[in-house]
Curated annotation (Swiss-Prot):
One GO MF term: phosphoglucosamine mutase activity
Residues that coordinate or bind Mg(2+): S100, D240, D242, D244
GO biological processes: carbohydrate metabolic process; peptidoglycan biosynthetic process; UDP-N-acetylglucosamine biosynthetic process
CDD domains: GlmM
Biological classification of the source: Bacteria, Bacillati, Bacillota, Clostridia, Thermoanaerobacterales
Keywords: Isomerase, Magnesium, Metal-binding, Phosphoprotein
Assigned GO CC terms: cytosol
Full protein name: Phosphoglucosamine mutase
Length: 443
């Protein structure tokens, strides 16, 4: 990856790292590069509910307009809705101003191609060269050639209609608590679930620009877990700031994570004869229980590095229609080109209604192995990862765990080594992790 773009676009503290000046340059460079690569009506621009969204949207739009491309403005909108609208409006590309589940001080800008997929690395690298001044943008249109802003007033209606059409059964009788993370889901998710017949109790659905993801949403589901029990609901749904992921809570107040949601949806699709190529893509961090649950069903599990970008690549390469992460970032390629928390929630509710089972019963189809994850701060990740002592410690741990597994990997962004183990016995699993950490700390 280049100097600006990370695995999920350009991110940083708004107005310090991600400044309006940088947003303008990004808009200008992206519009110039994407205009040459893809035909279309302009660039769809949407955002989440962060206070810095207005500032960055204005600057990004100015950059796009300055190279003669139109801006199709959709306002506050879930990230996956922008991927869909980019396709639906036959746009050149899509741009999202969001930092997803990060704190409100952060923001980010990422782009989708005209087909609604994240941009390939080489396109991001080309955009980067223009932003950093390594290449000069040779055009400066004047007069009638300058771009215009078009307000897409029916954007919410278009996405709502699209999302609702991904399910067949009404949700009447379902009582659902929905945590909108004070983010982009606030204006869309509760309405979609209600219009399909569910009784919806929304919480954290009053964004003020500064409360996005604040002790709420998929990274802080504790309030939702309590609310589901207090309200006597059948389930709870926790979105994050840009609604590209969802976690669920069963009627007893227990968390149902992305691994369990994939097992529930994957098994249902197989039963209905809809699981194309009979395979699913997960990351190395997915719980061992997931692999065992799918093995029992004869479903092939493919593993990738952590990150939805890698999950999507593997899905496209192997013709899989479902893939995702424990965090609730799940891609259902039959419906959308990126992780879509609202559409994932709809498929989950469809299984509950179709099977006539409680979510707690469905979640039991994947018994979770106790998982222990600890981080060790180190000076030289490469040296430690290559050491023979570490390899021996891992082998000893694997022997001790028996049926479990151990994963030791360096962090991609910090000076840390992550040690994760899974096993049938929680106490033994923790002991094994601590023993490996003790070896790392001596190296």
């Amino acid at each position: 990856m280049g100097k600006l773009f990370g695995t999920d676009g350009v991110r940083g503290v708004a107005n310090r790292d991600l400044t309006p000046e940088l947003a303008y340059k990004l808009g200008r460079a992206a519009a110039y590069v994407l205009k040459k690569k893809y035909n279309g009506q302009g660039i769809v621009v949407g955002k989440d509910t962060r206070i810095s969204g207005d500032m960055l949207e204005t600057a990004l739009a100015a950059g796009i307009l300055s190279v003669g491309l139109n801006v199709l403005r959709v306002g506050v909108m879930p990230t996956p809705a922008i991927a869909y609208l980019t396709r639906e409006l036959k746009a050149t590309a899509g741009a999202v101003i969001s930092a997803s589940h990060n704190p409100m001080e952060d923001n980010g800008i990422k782009f989708f191609s005209g087909s609604g997929f994240k941009l390939p690395d080489e396109v991001e690298e080309e955009i980067e060269k223009y932003v950093l001044g390594e290449k000069e943008i040779p055009i400066r249109p004047i007069g009638a050639e300058i771009g215009r802003v078009r307000e897409i007033s029916d954007a919410v209606l278009l996405y709502k209609s699209f999302a609702k059409n991904t399910v067949e059964l009404p949700f009447s009788g379902l009582r659902v608590v929905v945590d909108c993370a004070n983010g982009a889901a606030s204006y869309v998710a509760p309405k979609i679930y209600e219009e399909l017949g569910a009784e919806v109790i929304p919480i954290f659905n009053t964004p003020d620009g500064t409360n996005i993801n604040a002790n709420c949403g998929s990274t802080h589901p504790e309030a939702l877990m309590r609310a589901v029990v207090e309200e006597g609901a059948h389930l709870g749904l926790a979105h994050d700031g840009d609604a590209d992921r969802v976690l669920a809570v069963d009627e007893k107040g227990n968390l149902v994570d992305g691994d369990q949601i994939m097992v529930i949806i994957g098994k249902y699709l197989k039963k209905k004869g809809l699981l194309k190529n009979n395979r699913i893509v997960v990351t190395v961090m997915s719980n061992l229980g997931l692999k065992k649950a799918f093995a029992r069903e004869g479903i092939e599990v493919l593993e990738t590095k952590v990150g939805d970008r890698y999950v999507l690549e593997e899905m496209l390469k192997n013709g899989a229609i479902i893939g995702g992460e424990q965090s609730g970032h799940i891609i259902l390629l039959d419906h959308n080109t990126t992780g879509d928390g609202i559409i994932t929630a709809l498929q989950l509710m469809q299984v509950i209604v179709a099977e006539g089972k409680k979510l707690s019963e469905l979640a039991q189809e994947m018994p979770k192995f106790p998982q222990v994850l600890k981080n060790v701060r180190v000076l030289d990740k490469e040296k430690i990862m290559a050491s023979e002592e570490l390899a021996k410690a891992i082998a000893r741990g694997e022997k001790k765990l028996g049926e479990g597994r151990i994963l030791v990997r360096p962090s991609g962004t910090e000076p840390l080594i992550r040690v994760m183990a899974e096993g049938a016995d929680a106490k033994l699993t923790e002991e094994v992790v601590d023993e490996i950490i003790a070896v790392i700390e001596k190296l």
